[in-house]
Amino acid sequence: MNEGIAGKLAKQFINSKITPLLMVASLLVGLLATFMTPREEEPQIVVPMVDIYIPFPGAAPSEVEDRVARSVERTLTEIPGVDYVYSTSMQDFALVTVRYKVGEDAEASMVKLWATLMKNMDKMPQGVQMPLMKKVSIDDVPVLNLTFWGKDAKPYELRKAAVEVADQLKQIKDIGDVEVKGGLKRQIRVLLDKNKLAAHNVSAFQIVKQLQNSNTHMTSGTLVNVNQEVIVRSGQFFESADDVGNIVVGLYAGSPLYLRDVARITDGPEEVDNYSFFGWGAADHEGRQGEYPAVTLTVAKRKGADATVLADQVLAKVDELRKTTVPSGITVTQTRNYGETATEKVFTLLEHLSIAIVAVTVIVAFFLGWRGALVNFMSVPITFALTLLVYYLFDYSLNRVTLFAL
């Protein structure tokens, strides 16, 4: 009987005493790979996308569209590898999004795009400023959202607490972009008194220019002494309302005229231009009700990082900061955790695979006998285990696509 290569190979494994050890080892390394392979919600599909911000101060949306957006769309569509270009025109600027074909090199695409823009900048209308490019990838999607809210907390206080927490979270390894959305930023406002300006013979233009010149920090030169060179820096940035009020804006009756003499200066939240609330729906299992001012802190991961591990590290750090940084009247609630959902999907898959293996084994045993059932019971888990090992060795991640492939 001609067994062939496959038959001879199978015969060697059937007769070998190390075959059971290889089977057990395959199951163990597959189980280990399941926990070591990075888990994430979204697959690592390379679809280069770039957002281009083109400032055009003073232009209305219709003018931005006619004079900037349409011409840029036509120009960028001609770049090799570009799949789609679309734009949004708003007051003072245009947002152009360029999407490349799947598999295009992201860095090379950015270089080609920038070169094309610079080559055609002379065709832009007068007043258009230098464009700003920002690459968009799947890793920009936040894997964790933390919402700061409180019954008596103000939006300014919520944002201040969230920003302080965000600064601490940026020190964690493999963390990507950390953003704070909602709330009110700190703003120092200068409210000029026109009567005092007229009385002291000072114009608003003078004050604006003096504020711009004073809010700087630069290198003024160097001092050399005994073979040592000391760098001299002058000026400083404004840090408080007192710093702004102490700016000298002119002379009056031979004495310095300070900004606080002709204006009222406040240090507090900016003017409200958006509202963000946190609340519960009617189906909440604890019966909670109400809506409260809120600020959301979003955390994205770096490419290739494990969303589950990163989310656990962030949550552990936040638990520490609750005691030191977050005020007592502010509650931090987890509103999104892709690391948690990714882990749930992995274990749900393993559970369903186990049920399927047992069901198939029972059916095979009923119709073909226990020998065929035993082969099925052992071969299927080993195959999946080795597949998971291959995922780990080739730097794949466990996500909705790779899990579906299993």
Each predicted region: which residue ranges?
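Membrane-proximal extracytoplasmic
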Residues: M1-I357, A365, V375, Y396-V401
